[in-house]
């Protein structure tokens, strides 16, 4: 089924939030959506994001930290910004691309429990989207 839609998760560094969103997206949306993530910059995948996702049996060790790809951005059906910085500085999207903002706290540099909380919040949000389309 190659009539999949494309969802593109964006945050500042493509290190934590968007990496987790990509993983949850593949889990909950993978049969209907091509799921990608990127950042305004590429900071590398945060080891605590890898560890947090491992706790829920999702392996993101092979995910890469990438800057926004104009080709994916321009052909995406849905672009989701995950932080206010990405929302404000994200390159403009064409009129046919639906763009929404789902804000989540940045766990980088914070306590371990923050990674777990943000991971769970992102997972719940994407699960809800998979069930309701919103």
Swiss-Prot record:
Is Disulfide bond one of the keywords UniProt gives this record? yes
Gene Ontology BP annotations = response to arsenic-containing substance
Q: Name one GO cellular component term.
A: cytoplasm
Write out the catalytic residues in the record. 11 (nucleophile), 83 (nucleophile), 90 (nucleophile)
InterPro entries, A to Z: Arsenate_reductase_ArsC, Ptyr_pPase, Ptyr_pPase_sf
Q: Mind listing the UniProt keywords for this protein, alphabetically? A: Arsenical resistance, Cytoplasm, Disulfide bond, Oxidoreductase, Redox-active center
| Highest taxon, organism lineage | Bacteria
Which SUPFAM superfamilies has this protein been placed in? Phosphotyrosine protein phosphatases I (SSF52788)
Q: What is its EC number?
A: 1.20.4.4
Which Pfam families did the record assign? LMWPc
Q: What class of enzyme is it?
A: oxidoreductase
Residue runs in coiled coils: none
| Gene Ontology terms, MF aspect | arsenate reductase (thioredoxin) activity; protein tyrosine phosphatase activity
Signal peptide span? none
Q: Where in the cell is it found?
A: Cytoplasm
Its primary localisation, in coarse terms, equals cytoplasm
Cysteine pairs forming cystine bridges in this chain are 11-83, 83-90
Catalytic activity reported: arsenate + [thioredoxin]-dithiol + H(+) = arsenite + [thioredoxin]-disulfide + H2O
NCBIfam families linked to this entry: arsC_pI258_fam, PRK13530.1
Q: What does this protein do?
A: Catalyzes the reduction of arsenate [As(V)] to arsenite [As(III)].
Similarity field: Belongs to the low molecular weight phosphotyrosine protein phosphatase family. Thioredoxin-coupled ArsC subfamily.
Tell me what this protein is called. Arsenate reductase
Organism field: Bacillus thuringiensis subsp. konkukian (strain 97-27)
């Amino acid at each position: 089924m190659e009539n999949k839609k494309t969802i593109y998760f964006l945050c500042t560094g493509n290190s934590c939030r968007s990496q987790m969103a990509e993983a949850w997206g593949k889990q909950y949306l993978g049969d209907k959506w091509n799921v990608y993530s990127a950042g305004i910059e590429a900071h590398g995948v945060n080891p605590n994001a890898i560890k947090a996702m491992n706790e829920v049996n999702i392996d993101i060790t092979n995910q890469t930290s990438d800057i926004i790809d104009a080709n994916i951005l321009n052909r995406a059906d849905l672009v989701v910004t995950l932080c206010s910085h990405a929302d404000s500085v994200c390159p403009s999207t064409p009129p046919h691309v639906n763009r929404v903002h789902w804000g989540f706290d940045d766990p980088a540099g914070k306590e371990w429990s923050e990674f777990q909380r943000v991971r769970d919040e992102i997972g719940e949000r994407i699960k809800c989207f998979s069930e309701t389309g919103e």
